[in-house]
């Protein structure tokens, strides 16, 4: 069975995959797999930009999304979807007419002019023509997108956003907790301060020392409520709450005592 593996840590947001998909499918139909994709309003391959943290401790994470390749969509679509021998699926442009209900699935878009739902086909027409990978994968300069037989792909630690999907992800962003320890009296940052990230149950999740800029960052921690406990030699330990349940947390510049 064919599948995609997307390594979020490798994606730099160049949008090549998104542009290549539009280039391949806009202005051309590839029947029986797909009718022409509209110039606007549809992104069968779409790169989501996530701005995380707060100034000056911010990060931008890019997450490519590819639609249409899931068992859930197949179950809902019935005979309007076709599964190829290689496992790729596509919505039949003729049999799917009028099925606007299928647009509730991620990456499925409604074509008002043609009255059909449309989504990724895995560039089945190119695979039939001898290509080894779809356009989006071929255009990725960092190899963030990979495509092939499941048995040949490295799925160790990979996860699906949708159960039964042919799209697997590696290094999906979790949360980060960051800050800077400052000696305001001396007008200097605190280098080498001990910092711990402590869970609600009191367990130390991670620990590190502040760097040459007085900064610390606990990256890829699970979404949860934490406490940051830090101590500068010769000073009393201090504690700050850091609720990373919903968002990444920057506790800002904090005093040594």
Model-predicted segments: where are they?
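Structured interaction patches on ligand/partner-binding surfaces of diverse proteins
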Residues: 233-257
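Hydrophobic loop/turn residues within beta-sheet-rich immunoglobulin-like superfamily modules
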Residues: 11, 70, 94, 221, ...
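Exposed aromatic-hydrophobic patches
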Residues: 91-93, 215-220
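Short, acidic Ser/Thr/Gly-rich low-complexity loop/linker segments typical of extracellular
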Residues: 200-215
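Flanking helices and flexible, charged tails adjoining ferredoxin-like Fe-S electron-transfer domains
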Residues: 29-75, 79-80, 90-180
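Short, ordered, surface-exposed loop/turn motifs in non-cytosolic proteins
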Residues: 175-177, 184-201
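A short, solvent-exposed beta-strand micro-motif common in secreted/extracellular proteins
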Residues: 222-234
